Amino acid sequence: MTILDTIKEYKLKEIEKDKKIISVSRIEELAKAASPVRNFYAAIKHAQKDGYGLIAEIKKASPSKGLIREDFNPEKLATAYEEGGATCLSVLTDKPSFMGDKDFLTNARKSTQLPALRKDFMYDTYQVTEARALNADCILIIMASVSDQQAEELEHAAVSWLSLIHI
């Protein structure tokens, strides 16, 4: 079993649990009520006029390195990244492998004017809608972890905002 297989196994269980806590219809309501989308793509393109667009990552831990930062504060990191010239944020929300949290995304985005990407392992359109409900401006679809059909479904679910595909 590969690491992606392990992640997929726990993610599918997590998604089913989440759907029991917040129904699909309720998460759709929350997504519609979310703050306006900040255009991730436009921010990168605009920044490239002056050289490059920097996507700054907010990550507490990783499977390979373990805990990266003990004094982890997503809001302070987001603010520091913005002040340091970052163009966009990438916020890890996966808990088991990266010690992430959905609140990290919401709070980091709230503390800046930067567009924010939800970096997680996406397998279900529920997660896409949930990302928008959390005020994500963009999602990441990791192509190595989904079928082409799943990727199309996820991208279609994010059609009104921007999705990135990571191969």
Briefly describe each language-model feature range:
Residues N39-A43, P74-A80, R118-K119, Q127-V128:
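Short, charged beta->alpha transition segments
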Residues E70-L89, S111, E130-D137, A151-L154, ...:
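Alpha/beta enzyme core
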Residues I55-K59, L92, L117-K119, I142:
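A cross-family glycoside hydrolase active-site/sugar-binding cleft signature
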Residues A116, D120, Q127, A133-L134, ...:
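Active-site beta->alpha loop and helix N-cap motifs at the rims of alpha/beta catalytic domains
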Residues D94-A108, F121-T129, M143-A157:
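Active-site-adjacent beta->alpha loops and helix N-cap segments on the catalytic face
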Residues I165-I167:
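Conserved small/polar residues in nucleotide/adenosyl-binding loops
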Residues T2-R69:
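An N-cap/entry alpha-helix motif that binds or orients negatively charged groups
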